[in-house]
Amino acid sequence: MKKIKRALALALAAAMSTMLLAGCGPKITVQQNGSPAGTASQDSQAAPADTGAQTTEGTDAAAAPAALTFAPGTVLRMATGYNSEKTGLFFDAETAGSGITLADGKTYNAGDLKPTWVAVEEKLGVKFENKYQGNSASKEFEYWKERLTDVDMVSGTAALLTENGIAGDLVNIGQYLDQMPHFKAYLDANPIVKLSITGDTSTGAIYFSPYFDGVNDIERMPLMRIDWVQKLLDGEGEFSADASNTTAAPVYQPYMPTSGKVEVDVVNADGTAAEKVTKDYDTAGNIVAKMNEAGEIDGVTAVNMLRTYIDEAYGGYYGTQRSDLFVGQNAAWDADELVALLRCVVANPQTLNGTDSIQGLFTREDNNNQRRVDMFRFAGTLFGVRGLESRQDYLYVGNDGAMHDARQEAATYEALGKLHDMVEEGLISKAFVDKSEENSGTYLENDLGFMHYDYNQTQTILNETKLQKEDGEKYMAVMVPVARWYDGTNADGVYMHFTESWRSVKTDGWGISVKGIGDDQDKLNAALSLIDFAYTDEGMILLSYGPDAFIKQGETFDFNGKQMPVIADATREELWEKADGNYTNYARYYLGSTLSFVKNQAFEYQCTTDIGQEGAGHISRGIALGVIKHPELEVAENSWYTSVPTILPTSTVDNNTLSGYTELTEKFSQQKDGDSVLVNIIVNGIGALDSSISDAQAAADYVSGSWSGKQYLAIKESAWQNALSYYQSQK
């Protein structure tokens, strides 16, 4: 096995100064900047604000909203974290061990607050008490659902928090927006976000604080061993090798045309402008059709067929650097071309890794359902299917303005069938098929895996920890594929780069327990102040970067047009020492940041490897130049491009009805310990849905009829129309 160990710096940053906080005394008033403003008298305690501005008869001016005041040291019992004991506000025993010293020079023990939350305590004048059970958002809320008197703030999914808020168990945060100027300003500036968290359009009720893991940017992307693509496709003359395997008997059939011409937009090679390229099927034919006609062929023949196809189909556009079709700034690859490439990769392990076996397409953890579902997400990207990377269930807004459910559409099952064909040809990893233990780290460390679909930063750090970068090994994000998408602008569809994987409100958040705070105004105001603080500039940096001791003082850099802090050298070294360069794990496990509020991507960007930045740069330029299309965080003029809200405003009656549609929840789970019938179809074929089903339309009809999909969609469509009306009324 190959692994490069990164040298670690021994010097740590200077210790962070601390401030003592009094546990009792006069009230704390939170100012407009989110900071305590000295003290206010006990009589200045804020009363709950009514929804909307209050006016007095005969006057035009609304009364100023009361400040959020609470006693110093007000305790908030927090059942909050992110899917694991390691990612709570407090150090768990495994992470802290016998004591862990961080880059701030402080030593932390099990049960201690993490540095970010120490700073929040000091900043706001609150005290946090740990109640987190270390569960996923849904399981954490279910654990506390009958114990809400014992917690003040609790994690949950957006759907669960809203459903239980409507039932009266969680505080309507929307009622207090006038007292939360920073949160309100953020929602006013991002109306689709407000729509995404509004649980009741008649009152404007909001029952949870949303979580953004970055906003308005691509989330997942394809990643490939680009050095392998270059080795197979680039250069003058024919490819040759002393040994190769034979491709499997062909099963996969063409998705793209077999004749005619298709013109698509690409970014030019130097990334400065968009241009058009033509896929000429009249001249080159379809590569899958040609390979299928040839049957089982040796790997060398397969590579030379693909080389010739690229030269002819693109009229020499890529020259001898044919790999750019897949991995270049000007990439224009599609599903058929990827299948041809996978056939070449799997049939040429002797050239690529010196063994007799390579796995083509894999997932981050082939035995973890939460990661296995990335395979059907990728299917949507490959074959032009909306709803498989939705922000809510499997919903998307069609070009007809109505809500659609991917589970009830034949195109979904056709796409999954295509991936099943790839399974039959051995192009998808055996561990994925067998649901056995294997992960992206071991695939790359042992040169056994070619590509997967995932997050850029966490996966490209494997270039530093698993690959031999100095020998040219390179795992990098590549442009999203060209597919036929039916956005309504052409009845025959549009061949274009499109991603549905777009950052908006995530499906988790934090709610305030009505029974927990009871009639304690201090607790209510402290909880509301915490949420509002997260939307100040100071709060956003603290909750993304951690405290000042982890930041290089006096230095900033330009990130998306805004000056953002630079992380301290000791922080950067510690990131590699403790988390192998994984920003998200480091921030959550050790700093306590990136939890449930607005995560600024500037920290993560600095922690991204040069290879990670290179691939992401290609994609970012594609987005900026309009080559890569994506959902929009607004109600778009063409409704097909509208991002689906994370929740839709359904009534208690609706929620009770929806909860009875258990197949739609259990059969399509994306949880770690759940089971996804969509994944099962990829592995076992369409019959995995039900043994009576033999085609895609029958599968869609089965979900619609036998599993109450039709009734589910009617409820969601009604809620969507109500949400649209509310959105228009707020403009």
Where are these regions (language model features)?
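A bilobed periplasmic-binding-protein/Venus flytrap-type ligand-binding module shared by bacterial periplasmic
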Residues: 222-226, 230, 505-522, 542
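Short, solvent-exposed loop/beta-turn-alpha elements that line the ligand-binding surface or hinge
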Residues: 99-101, 174-189, 231, 235-241, ...
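C-terminal motif of bacterial Sec signal peptides marking the signal peptidase cleavage site
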Residues: 19-23
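Conserved N-terminal structural module of periplasmic/extracytoplasmic solute-binding proteins
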Residues: 25-205, 213-224, 228-320, 405, ...
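Extracytoplasmic/periplasmic solute-binding protein
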Residues: 196-214, 257-323, 330-398, 448-451, ...
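Conserved small-residue motifs centered on glycine
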Residues: 533, 537-681
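Short helix-initiation/N-cap motifs at beta->coil->alpha
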Residues: 131-140, 335-337, 433-445
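Glycine-centered hinge/linker elements that transmit conformational signals in sensory
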Residues: 396-430
